[in-house]
């Protein structure tokens, strides 16, 4: 499961954080990406911005089995640039 949020200024932030905690407690694989840019994130940026890249990487990974930088590799491990970027909050549980 994937949750992408627009940070504390996002109206959905508290619910998304709570959903992450509850789903993770069930042992269901889950990722959360959040950047403080508000509800809707940067989806209206050229080509959908980072939010669209994250969404597409998740779909590529789970629907196409893509483990490269256009799939799982963008979201976890050494290829995850969001994971080391201080502008992003990234959490994961039970991801393999």
Predicted segment positions?
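Catalytic active-site module of serine/aspartate enzymes centered on a nucleophile-bearing elbow/loop
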Residues: 48-96
